[in-house]
C-alpha cells in the first residue's frame, strides 16, 4: 500500500503518514514527535479539518435528505458543507498556529495524540455552541 499510490495519496494518506493516531500493539511509541512549528501546525490543522468535516458532512447529508423537496431549502446542505470546509481554513489555521506557537515557545515537543485531542475538543466546543445558539432561536 505504501508504493501502490503514486502521487495521489489524498488527505487520509497524509494523516496516516504523520502518525497522528498511535498504533496499539506493535510495540512502537511516539518515535517521531512533532518538534518544529510547521509539523505541529500541520498536524493540528489536519485534525481540525477532519474533525470538522466529520460533523458537517453528516449534517449536510441529513439536510439534503430532509429538504430535498423544498424549493430553496435544499441549498442549506451546500452551506453546511461549505462551513465544514471554510471554518477550519479560517479559524482552524489561526488556532492551529496559536497552539503550535505556544508549544514551540515553551520548547515542548508535541506528541501526535495531543494534536488530535486539541482539535477534536475544539470542534466539539464549536458544535455545542452552535447547537445552543440554534436552540435559543426556537
Swiss-Prot record:
Q: Where found?
A: Endoplasmic reticulum membrane; Nucleus envelope
Its transmembrane ranges are 45-65, 80-100, 111-131
Which residues face the membrane's Lumenal side? 1-44, 101-110
Q: Which GO terms describe its cellular component?
A: endoplasmic reticulum membrane; nuclear envelope
Question: What biological function has been recorded for the protein in this entry?
Answer: May regulate membrane morphogenesis in the endoplasmic reticulum (ER) by promoting ER sheet formation at the expense of ER tubules.
Query: Is Endoplasmic reticulum among the key words of this record?
Result: yes
Gene Ontology terms describing biological process: endoplasmic reticulum tubular network organization
Residues with attached carbohydrate: 26
Which keywords does this chain's UniProt record carry?
Answer: Endoplasmic reticulum, Glycoprotein, Membrane, Nucleus, Transmembrane, Transmembrane helix
Q: What is its main location?
A: endoplasmic reticulum
Q: Which family does it belong to?
A: Belongs to the TMEM170 family.
Q: What is the name attached to this protein's record?
A: Transmembrane protein 170A
List residues in topological domain: Cytoplasmic.
Answer: 66-79, 132-138
InterPro entries membership: Transmembrane_pr_170
Give the source lineage, highest ranks first: Eukaryota, Metazoa, Chordata, Craniata, Vertebrata
Membrane topology listed for this record: Multi-pass membrane protein
